[in-house]
From Swiss-Prot:
Name assigned to this protein: Lamina-associated polypeptide 2, isoforms beta/gamma
Modified residues (Phosphoserine): 59, 66-67, 79, 156, 159, 166, 168, 177, 180, 184, 190, 222, 224, 250, 254, 265, 292, 306, 315, 362, 378, 385, 402
Region: NAKAP95-binding C, residue numbers: 300-374
Expression across tissues: Expressed in many tissues. Most abundant in adult thymus and fetal liver.
Organism in which the protein naturally occurs: Homo sapiens
UniProt modification remark: Mitosis-specific phosphorylation specifically abolishes its binding to lamin B and chromosomes.
Pfam families listed in its UniProt record: LEM, Thymopoietin
Subunit record text: Interacts with LMNB1, LMNB2, BANF1, AKAP8L, GMCL and chromosomes. Isoform Zeta interacts with BANF1/BAF and may sequester it in the cytoplasm.
Topological domain ranges for the Lumenal compartment: 435-454
Entry-annotated residues carrying Citrulline: R320
GO cellular component terms attached to this protein's record: cytoplasm; membrane; nuclear envelope; nuclear inner membrane; nuclear membrane; nucleus
Length: 454
């Protein structure tokens, strides 16, 4: 009866499959993890070694004597399944020492997303990393770093050679089995990469607090908008009655919305007619905005009180110093001034689009030749044409008059020709009249004596 391994995790997945098929064990459908085949090996094959255990046999230890012929088919998966099982049993003790640490790490391999911030910090310190503060934004980065360190640790363990006793050819064959164990470790590394697909719950968990915060903010905003400040008057007898100003405000409010001041007036007695003469204080609703109406404490006699409703405006400054109280007339004047200013702006800029800030911007023209833009001649031609057509607004009067006179002296061409013909005819007539006249003043010059010339 062949002896089977007590720790089948030494074998690779392919060897486990071949052993199970050789011993007529039905395998599960589809591709399964190595742990599934290890469990099948323990249930069906390792269980066969248990009956001889009470007799004092040690299944974990290697056999005392074994021939080389039995160990030769160890690296080859084939017909010698029984001999291969014996040889693996011989190497079992040594190989389990190597693979104990990865198995223990697999047991300790928890989901990184389930670790708390302190546990994650401890794991990083174990790997020699000095992390900073772990918060919601940096947690993902440290989780990725921890996964990388675990992968590197498993790869370094699989790549480091183990010291072996080189006394005979048997030890060399044991080293061959160690190589197969190394290959099994590589398969486990690939499984760790498959475990990285569990990062999807990271996104879900990161999103859940955001949604909870949003819900809380919306809930708080609804409460802050529902906050109401009420001022109630309780009049007693005709002689006097206590004046109580009850201010009620919601305690739960969003952090960003400014809190309102809660003021409680002191209890004091006031005559009945004084209350009737004074202006009644209505209920003021505290809105979620920064401005609110708060009734100041009333001191002294009500007879000298003026019908002025003080208004305190709270700004966004942490101290929230109240501003100077304003009367109703001043508030009305300010609103009228604002309206007038708005009308003036609309009159000055009628074609400007109205914006909430009152600031309008126009597109900037690009600088020619800047930022490596090519120079285009068309731009310069446009400039020349514009400069030639440019006409100054202010021209001296003398130039304008000269231009008008020049335009008025311009004579049509046919009038010029007519005048030329008239002048020519006049000169011709004058010449003819001079020839017919005997007393010609130029006759002495025309008829020269030839003798004088000789």
């Amino acid at each position: 009866m062949p002896e089977f391994l007590e720790d089948p995790s030494v074998l690779t997945k392919d060897k486990l499959k071949s052993e199970l098929v050789a011993n007529n064990v039905t395998l599960p459908a589809g591709e399964q993890r190595k742990d599934v085949y290890v469990q099948l090996y323990l249930q069906h094959l390792t269980a066969r070694n248990r009956p001889p255990l009470p007799a004092g046999t040690n299944s974990k230890g290697p056999p005392d004597f074994s021939s080389d012929e039995e160990r030769e088919p160890t690296p080859v998966l084939g017909s010698g399944a029984a001999a291969a099982g014996r040889s693996r049993a011989a190497v079992g003790r040594k190989a389990t020492k190597k693979t104990d640490k990865p198995r223990q790490e697999d047991k300790d391999d928890l989901d990184v997303t389930e670790l708390t911030n302190e546990d994650l910090l401890d794991q990083l310190v174990k790997y020699g990393v000095n992390p900073g503060p772990i918060v919601g934004t940096t947690r993902k980065l440290y989780e990725k770093k921890l996964l990388k360190l675990r992968e590197q640790g498993t790869e370094s363990r699989s790549s480091t050679p183990l010291p072996t006793i080189s006394s005979s050819a048997e030890n060399t064959r044991q080293n061959g089995s160690n190589d197969s164990d190394r290959y099994s470790d590589n398969e486990e590394d690939s499984k760790i990469e498959l475990k990285l697909e569990k990062r999807e719950p990271l996104k879900g968990r990161a999103k859940t607090p955001v949604t909870l915060k949003q819900r809380r903010v919306e809930h708080n905003q609804s409460y802050s908008q529902a906050g109401i400040t009420e001022t109630e008057w309780t009049s007693g007898s005709s002689k006097g009655g206590p004046l109580q100003a009850l201010t009620r405000e919601s305690t739960r409010g969003s952090r960003r919305t400014p809190r309102k001041r809660v003021e409680t007036s002191e209890h004091f007695r006031i005559d009945g007619p004084v209350i009737s003469e004074s202006t009644p204080i209505a209920e003021t609703i505290m809105a979620s905005s920064n401005e609110s109406l708060v009734v100041n404490r009333v001191t002294g006699n009500f007879k000298h009180a003026s019908p002025i409703l003080p208004i305190t405006e709270f700004s966004d400054i942490p101290r929230r110093a109240p501003k100077k109280p304003l009367t109703r007339a001043e508030v009305g004047e300010k609103t009228e001034e604002r309206r007038v200013e708005r009308d003036i702006l609309k009159e000055m800029f009628p074609y400007e689009a109205s914006t909430p800030t009152g600031i309008s911007a126009s597109c900037r023209r690009p600088i020619k030749g800047a930022a490596g833009r090519p120079l285009e001649l068309s731009d310069f031609r446009m400039e020349e044409s514009f400069s030639s057509k440019y006409v100054p607004k202010y021209v001296p009067l003398a130039d304008v008059k000269s231009e008008k006179t020049k335009k008025g002296r311009s004579i049509p061409v046919w009038i010029k020709i007519l005048l030329f013909v008239v002048v020519a005819v006049f000169l011709f007539l004058v010449y003819q009249a001079m020839e017919t006249n005997q007393v010609n003043p130029f006759s002495n010059f025309l008829h020269v004596d030839p003798r004088k010339s000789n």
